[in-house]
């Protein structure tokens, strides 16, 4: 019997506000344990939460970006559970009326076609703290993360393969990153994924019993974990067994999923409205104010790059991989740069430099205008492509005008025959053996002189002019 795979994803995205959702403590990542806490985070008796407006702004922005309806009368709920990293013994979340609902995004499939994935809801909530179990026999609680704002984005079970789940996550991350509400760095925990998966015989409408997968620390692990779960569940069903509703974790060392616990239902959390927070009204003017801040999203940018700027689909995809890179490219084109040349530099020397330095485009000193200026210096023969690489490194590290640096550093390309011919004659005088080889007809002997000339001019000889003059002067040696 063959089975259809049914997948839905729950994605927690950490919002990059300066302070936490209900307290004034810093939400910054990477501080010393418990440095970013106060009495609200520690749940001291009598303290009351105060909602951070910036979190609601981010929630509205996410909902709009994901084509969602917005609950204009918004409230919060208590999700009750006990764990050491949760000192209140409940989490403030949203249950029956999330900030966003009934949304969708479009994903691109391997064959180039597209598919719409529905999004059931997006709700705001606070993160929990972090437990660390030491080798000394003690467990330690760090509440820096307690109260950091999250938005949980819950898809419908519309994905039919691990590959579709991977494509959905890629598209979702791209959209969220473009809104600016999160850096969506999985390695820092600002994007976390739980997957729900079940199988059913083809033709059956009713979903099978699902399992939830956790410990999915990368999109690749999501794909691998889901693939293993497809195989595990299919094997059980084909042998006449039944799937248990449970939570499993993915073990990257074995490539298998391992049982964690029997899955709880929402009734186990005893949700009820949060009594310490009021009902919040999100009016149309607030929504439109946030809508005005939305950027042009990657799909539209890629279409523009291909249809109007003449780039390939591949180049367009690379340039829109981050909003910062796409913005840089567009600014360079607006400054007069040729789209293809700018694209080549960004995907070539610039990308190599960023990878080597471990930086992003906005973290270096290079500006779009300076890159365009440097490309123009190549085009008009002021510098060679080889010298341009040196100029670029300087601009990336120090910034400033490309033209000013080229002139100050003496990097202007030598194209004047009156300057180059005497240097060529000196090269002949300094390399008598090579001259003798050339005169005797030794194969490829003439090619050595190109290297000699470039060395003598410290790479500043115009390659095309140099080749022409070398051929001319070498011919005279045979007269």
Swiss-Prot record:
Record's keyword annotation contains Nucleotide-binding: yes
This enzyme's EC code(s): 6.3.5.-
Pfam families listed in its UniProt record: GatB_N (PF02934), GatB_Yqey (PF02637)
Recorded catalytic activity of this chain's protein: L-glutamyl-tRNA(Gln) + L-glutamine + ATP + H2O = L-glutaminyl-tRNA(Gln) + L-glutamate + ADP + phosphate + H(+); L-aspartyl-tRNA(Asn) + L-glutamine + ATP + H2O = L-asparaginyl-tRNA(Asn) + L-glutamate + ADP + phosphate + 2 H(+)
SMART domains, alphabetized: GatB_Yqey
GO BP annotations listed: glutaminyl-tRNAGln biosynthesis via transamidation; translation
Superkingdom per UniProt: Bacteria
Keyword ATP-binding applies: yes
Gene3D superfamilies assigned: 1.10.10.410, GatB domain, N-terminal subdomain (1.10.150.380)
A GO molecular function held by the record: ATP binding
PROSITE patterns xref list: GATB
Keywords linked to the UniProt accession: ATP-binding, Ligase, Nucleotide-binding, Protein biosynthesis
Family according to the record: Belongs to the GatB/GatE family. GatB subfamily.
Subunit-level organization: Heterotrimer of A, B and C subunits.
Function statement: Allows the formation of correctly charged Asn-tRNA(Asn) or Gln-tRNA(Gln) through the transamidation of misacylated Asp-tRNA(Asn) or Glu-tRNA(Gln) in organisms which lack either or both of asparaginyl-tRNA or glutaminyl-tRNA synthetases. The reaction takes place in the presence of glutamine and ATP through an activated phospho-Asp-tRNA(Asn) or phospho-Glu-tRNA(Gln).
Protein name: Aspartyl/glutamyl-tRNA(Asn/Gln) amidotransferase subunit B
Gene source species: Streptococcus suis (strain 05ZYH33)
Lineage: Bacteria, Bacillati, Bacillota, Bacilli, Lactobacillales
């Amino acid at each position: 019997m063959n089975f259809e795979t049914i997948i839905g994803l729950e994605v927690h995205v950490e919002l990059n506000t300066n302070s936490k959702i209900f307290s004034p403590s810093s939400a910054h990542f990477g501080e010393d344990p418990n440095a970013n806490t106060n009495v609200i985070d520690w749940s001291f008796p009598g303290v009351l939460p105060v909602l951070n407006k910036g979190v609601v702004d981010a929630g509205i922005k996410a909902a709009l970006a994901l084509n969602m309806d917005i609950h204009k009368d918004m409230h919060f709920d208590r999700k009750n559970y006990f764990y050491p990293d949760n000192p209140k013994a409940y989490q403030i979340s949203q249950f029956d009326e999330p900030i966003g609902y009934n949304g969708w995004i479009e994903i691109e499939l391997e064959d180039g076609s597209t598919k719409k994935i529905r999004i059931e809801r997006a709700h705001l909530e606070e993160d929990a703290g972090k437990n660390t179990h030491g080798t000394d026999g003690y467990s330690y609680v760090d509440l820096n993360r307690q109260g950091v704002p999250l938005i949980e984005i819950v898809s419908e079970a519309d994905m039919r393969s691990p590959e579709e789940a991977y494509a959905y996550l890629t598209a979702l991350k791209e959209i969220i990153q473009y809104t600016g509400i999160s850096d969506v760095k999985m390695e820092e925990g600002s994007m976390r994924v739980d997957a729900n998966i079940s199988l059913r015989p083809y033709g059956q409408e009713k979903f099978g019993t699902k399992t939830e997968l956790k410990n999915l620390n990368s999109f690749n692990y999501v794909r691998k974990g889901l693939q293993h779960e497809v195989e595990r569940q299919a094997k059980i069903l084909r042998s006449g067994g039944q799937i248990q509703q449970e939570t499993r974790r993915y073990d990257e060392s074995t490539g298998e999923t391992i049982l964690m616990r029997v899955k709880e239902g929402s009734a186990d959390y005893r949700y009820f409205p949060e009594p310490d927070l009021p009902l919040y009204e999100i009016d149309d003017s607030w929504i439109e104010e946030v809508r005005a801040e939305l950027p042009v999203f990657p799909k539209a940018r890629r279409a523009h790059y291909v249809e109007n700027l003449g780039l390939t689909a591949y180049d367009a995809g690379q340039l829109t991989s981050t909003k910062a890179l796409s913005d840089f490219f567009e600014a360079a084109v607006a400054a007069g740069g040729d789209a293809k040349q700018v694209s080549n530099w960004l995907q070539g020397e610039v990308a190599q430099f960023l990878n080597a330095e471990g930086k992003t485009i906005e973290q270096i000193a290079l500006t779009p205008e300076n890159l365009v200026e440097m490309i123009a210096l190549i085009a008009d023969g002021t510098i060679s492509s080889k010298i341009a690489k040196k100029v670029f490194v300087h601009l990336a590290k120090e910034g400033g005008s490309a033209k000013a640096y080229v002139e100050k550093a003496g990097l202007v390309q030598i194209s004047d025959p009156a300057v180059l011919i005497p240097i060529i004659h000196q090269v002949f005088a300094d390399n008598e053996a090579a001259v003798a080889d050339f005169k005797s007809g030794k194969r490829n002997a003439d090619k050595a002189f190109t290297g000699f000339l470039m060395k003598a001019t410290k790479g500043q000889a115009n390659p095309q002019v140099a080749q022409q003059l070398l051929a001319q002067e070498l011919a005279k040696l045979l007269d």
